[in-house]
Amino acid sequence: MKQKNLITVVTDHQITADTIAKAIGANEKHDGYYLGNGYAVTWTNGQLVEATFSPQESFVLSTTMESRLAYAHNFKFAMRNYDELVGYKKSAEDNRQLDTIKNLWKMSLTVVNAMRPDITGDLDFLSLYYFIGCPGDTRRAWLPVLTKKAIVHAVNHGPQNRKEYEKWLEESIYNAIVQAAEENAELKGSPTVEEISVADAAKDAECAGVPAPAPGEQREGDNYIGVITDRCPLFNLPALMIQAACELDYTHEKTILTAYRLYAKKLISYPMVMQNTIPGGVWKAMLRNMEMLRYNSRWGRSIPEGKPSKCHNFRNGETVYNGFGIVTTGLHPTDLSRDEEKLYNLIVKRVIDAFAPDSYGCGRKSKGGKKKSRRYRKEKKVKTVKTA
């Protein structure tokens, strides 16, 4: 590691590091990192550094301290060292990987945070930053999808809307501190919004012994809104876990690991824990992605005509940094294991159902009131099909 003035990218796991490294040309594989083209890419193997709430003085909610410093002020940081009762203790591998990250950090002009795209990813990176104690410029690579174009832009330019990202991060760190301190204070920021199907809401209502809610009704909690819908919602991670358990007999752990591999292979968006609506930008991307799915040998013929439904677009002011429902990326799978293929097919089916046009199944009427027959699609020019 003799190279100086590196841009070092830090991510959660080697499988995502491999995808990022290929996208930015860091093709030399070393022990614990990739190197090349002016970049180094390394990984933490999960939450390498833990944060324990331990304020140095009585916590004051009205502090004007910058959010990142407030996090450092109220938490202590140490390498993970779980109790042996649960089967884990500090390992030599962790020490080696931390040394690798430290050495790369010291040689870097900029360190890029490419941890998973949610608040836990930001907090894990901050914990690592304060534990290592190396000064330097940092940048956030927000990567809800791991396509090459998205990676190159995020690594070199950071979030598309830096001001909006900083606002979300400040509010999220504040909320994390409030929850850790168990303070009775109102949480900040826009809510997480989850669409809940009428059928699932009816089951919950039956168990609770209350009337079933109607489409359009909402459930509200701390920074949370559940919207009852008569349309098929996109998966979030919990819904995917339940469906995979029912249809594929997958354990929850197997579903989580398999979904993460599909994300790392650039086939789906990051599986968010709660949010399952989508922003306008994702809907626009799905215009193309749904067309690419038409070339899928299994699912192509089941995609209805018309533009994807907009019924899942954000409607309660939530920020894009809350994430969005699991969608496909438009790339075609080429190297999936059987388990990955089965889960991918489950996700594709849900995406097709969720984005079915609003008018699907209803014949269009002419001015005279007669239904028009559905026109056959004109033959299109053969497109180049991109693969993962």
Describe these PLM feature segments:
Residues I24, K29-L61, V178-A212, I352-A388:
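Structured, non-catalytic alpha/beta "coupling" segments that mediate domain-domain communication
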Residues E164-A185, T258, K265-K349, Y360, ...:
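Extended, highly charged linker/hinge segments and catalytic-adjacent loops that couple domains
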Residues V10, S91, A114-I119, K167-E171, ...:
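Conserved phosphate/pyrophosphate-binding and hydrolysis machinery centered on Walker-type P-loop NTPases
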Residues V227-A244, S269-V273:
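Short acidic, hydrophobic short linear motifs in intrinsically disordered regions
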Residues D249-A264:
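Short amphipathic alpha-helical interaction segments
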Residues Q160-E164, G209-P233:
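Metal- or metallocofactor-binding catalytic centers and their adjacent structured scaffolds
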Residues M1-N184:
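Intrinsically disordered, low-complexity regulatory segments
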